[in-house]
Amino acid sequence: MVTASSSVRVSNEDECFIYDIEQLKDNVVVSYSTGSWSCFDKGTLLEIFKVPKAHTNITGIISCDQLNGVITCGSEGEIHLWDIRSQAKSAVRSWTQQSTPFTCIALNKKNQFATGSELTRSLASVQLWDVRSEQKLIRQWNDAHNDDITHLQFHPKDNELLLTGSVDGLVSLLDTTKEEDSTDPEEDPLLHVINHGASIHLAKFVSKKRVMVLSHMESYAMYKLKRDKDEKTWSSNELFSIDDLRAELSCSYVINEVSTSDKQFCALAFGDFSNHETKFVLVDTSTGELKKEPTKLERASEEICRAISFDVKNDVYYSGGEDGLLQAFRV
């Protein structure tokens, strides 16, 4: 059992939940249910600065190392780029899409970022933006899903490929170079669709050809993704699946996928309502099969853990949840 090497309560406000934890080189940034976010020193967990009320409800936060920044999005339809070097005194750039509640965000290595939206006026859309410009969005796709977008991730090697997940139970692969509504079938941006059958919590590339999917009902599967020889069509097949991870892992909920120091594996973090522990199960990124991991984190309360992140370089886990505590665990 690993106990916390340092802990900090992120706010004096009642019911201030930690939503997400993102890592920078020397810092971690944390978003809250109050619409605020803070930057902490990785080693000491001392708060360096706080951005109060950055959004009405902050729904996504990602690091942008190329610009020494952080990008956030919110349910009020705003996106902001913040400069860490100036302690985020004000947003460096902002983007707005009227009446579009953003739900999630992802960044590629070409300084482009994607956002997903709630179902609004019968449309659940995915947008592509240029982080270097406040001009209008590059592209928007409305046909990939028919309910709230819940998760986005760019391919680890191909910056033009975007994986999207939704409440509709579908995981879609988009070519972000292509426009929607093209009359040429070969120019269709929707390359492939996986029907997982339940609202998507997580849809993530764990390698170039493997996609892990986890639903809000805790159903789990690993899919092999294949580009056919003509390089115009894609296919997938399920390698491994579990109907309910709660029964398999004897837990109450699954938190998220986290990196490991071994590239053959990633891990799933999970918790239980009846104790303080956060546990892990290793996932073979080639087969999707699960392997027991002995590491356990003893958190400071029994409140639900909402976010966890692993610093591979320094062997430190960062966790946070509905107790409002940010904790570091050195393993």
Swiss-Prot record:
InterPro entries: WD40/YVTN_repeat-like_dom_sf, WD40_repeat_dom_sf, WD40_rpt, WDR89. The keyword Repeat applies. One of its GO terms (cellular component) is nucleus. WD repeats lie at residues 53-92, 97-139, 144-184, 300-331. PROSITE patterns: WD_REPEATS_2, WD_REPEATS_REGION. The keyword Plastid does not apply. PANTHER family: WD REPEAT-CONTAINING PROTEIN 89 (PTHR22889:SF0). This is Uncharacterized WD repeat-containing protein C63.06. It comes from Schizosaccharomyces pombe (strain 972 / ATCC 24843) (Fission yeast).
